[in-house]
Amino acid sequence: MRISDLLLPEFDVEMKNTRTTLERVPADKAEFAPHPRSMPLGRLAPHVAQLPAFGLIILTTPELDFAKANFKPVPFESAAQLVKVLEEGAAQTRKALAAIPDDAWNDNWKLTMQGKSIFDGSRFLAYRQMFLNHIVHHRAQLGVYLRMNEEKVPAI
């Protein structure tokens, strides 16, 4: 069995759980933040929706320099818009995940910012830590934001 065959079911569950969470994000609470140093909901929710695109970068490139990346955060409009962004990114990432050969998981992957190393390790570790664990972390934050705004928190 290929490594990607082991990872695809987990990817599918995490994307489903993320979709369920994003579906409940209230459009009228974009400015809400539980603490002055916390991201407002209108920035956190789009960040979560766009994270699969980061997974795609990890799976298909040897490195990313944030200073050279042409990243534009999506504006927060609605839960439906966030779900659409998530699903588009997840579909591309799933396709790349299904296609990646086993030996590519051991390839080195780097994340830098203006020449300064942020991450330097295996593609597998980058995928796991910087994409999958990252989306779970921020999805949990969204759950707290939902609870604090009397929204239903999905049972995931």
What are the residue ranges of the model-derived segments?
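Basic/polar N-terminal segments that are highly enriched at the extreme N-terminus
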Residues: M1-P9
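Short, conserved clusters of charged catalytic residues that mark active-site
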Residues: R2, E77, E88, Y127-M130
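Short, contiguous alpha-helical
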Residues: L8-E23, K29-K72, T112-I156
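Solvent-exposed, charged/polar functional surfaces in cytosolic regulatory/catalytic domains
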Residues: N17-T20, R24, E88, Q92-A99, ...
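Secondary-structure boundary/capping positions in well-ordered alpha/beta enzyme cores
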Residues: D28-K29, D103
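Helix-adjacent hinge/juxtasegments
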Residues: I57-I58, P62-P101
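Acidic catalytic patch
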Residues: A99-G115
